[in-house]
């Protein structure tokens, strides 16, 4: 009897279902380590703990001021050099323009100067007096050539310098004689010995004159 009860109890023990074990919840991960295994809070603490920038010393400030002064001096020197170069360039350009204008204005100077002796010869020849009809005809032809030459030079700006009766002008006249002359103020041209010429406002040859005392 006891043996039968024992078997029944053992069987009941074996047949009892297993109790479910409670499932433990996984712990939420802690905001842990970033690289290097350092917690974020500690990492932030390190950043906050960085020291402030160091103020420059008096020596560093003095060196910086000296460098600034040196740069300002160099800048001022470069500015002066630029202004000088610009002024030189402007002077060169103005001088070149004036030379070109003068070359255009006085382009006939060389030819006119070479023709002045020819005009002198024509004038001396035309002063000859003759009764010979053939010589008169030649002189008339020479006068026509002379007038044509004078007109051509006049178109280029060549003109004779006025002399007799004009006040002596050392720029226009060359005094070769002085003499008493009635009816003339002192220092007045009383006679023209050789005609002078000018090209526009430039004297090609001054007139050779006699001047009153």
Curated annotation (Swiss-Prot):
GO molecular function: adenyl-nucleotide exchange factor activity; protein homodimerization activity; protein-folding chaperone binding; unfolded protein binding
GO term, biological process aspect, one: protein folding
CDD domains: GrpE
SUPFAM superfamilies membership: Coiled-coil domain of nucleotide exchange factor GrpE, Head domain of nucleotide exchange factor GrpE
Pfam families: GrpE (PF01025)
PROSITE patterns reported in the protein's UniProt record: GRPE (PS01071)
GO cellular component: cytoplasm
Compositional bias ranges of the Acidic residues kind: 13-35
Chain segments carrying region Disordered: 1-61
The entry's keywords: Chaperone, Cytoplasm, Stress response
Coarse class of the protein's main subcellular location: cytoplasm
Localization per record: Cytoplasm
Function: Participates actively in the response to hyperosmotic and heat shock by preventing the aggregation of stress-denatured proteins, in association with DnaK and GrpE. It is the nucleotide exchange factor for DnaK and may function as a thermosensor. Unfolded proteins bind initially to DnaJ; upon interaction with the DnaJ-bound protein, DnaK hydrolyzes its bound ATP, resulting in the formation of a stable complex. GrpE releases ADP from DnaK; ATP binding to DnaK triggers the release of the substrate protein, thus completing the reaction cycle.
Similarity annotation: Belongs to the GrpE family.
Record note on quaternary structure: Homodimer.
Protein name: Protein GrpE
Organism: Geobacillus kaustophilus (strain HTA426)
Gene designation per UniProt: grpE
């Amino acid at each position: 009897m006891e043996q039968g009860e024992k078997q029944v109890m053992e069987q009941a023990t074996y047949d009892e279902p297993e109790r479910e074990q409670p499932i433990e919840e996984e712990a939420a991960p802690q905001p842990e380590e970033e690289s290097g295994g350092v917690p974020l809070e500690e990492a932030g603490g390190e950043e906050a703990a960085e020291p402030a920038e160091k103020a420059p010393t008096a020596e560093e400030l003095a060196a910086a001021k000296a460098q600034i002064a040196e740069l300002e001096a160099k800048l001022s020197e470069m500015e002066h050099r630029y202004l000088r170069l610009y002024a030189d360039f402007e002077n060169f350009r103005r001088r070149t323009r004036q030379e070109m204008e003068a070359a255009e204005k006085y382009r006939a100077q060389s030819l006119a100067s070479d023709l002045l002796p020819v005009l002198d010869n024509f004038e001396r020849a035309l002063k000859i007096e003759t009764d010979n009809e053939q010589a008169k005809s030649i002189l008339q032809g020479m006068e026509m050539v002379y007038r044509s030459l004078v007109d051509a030079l006049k178109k280029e700006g060549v003109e004779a310098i006025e002399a007799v009766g004009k006040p002596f002008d050392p720029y226009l006249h060359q005094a070769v004689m002085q003499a008493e002359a009635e009816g003339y103020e002192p220092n007045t041209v009383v006679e023209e010995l050789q005609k002078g010429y000018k090209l526009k406002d430039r004297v090609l040859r001054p007139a050779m004159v006699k001047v009153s005392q």
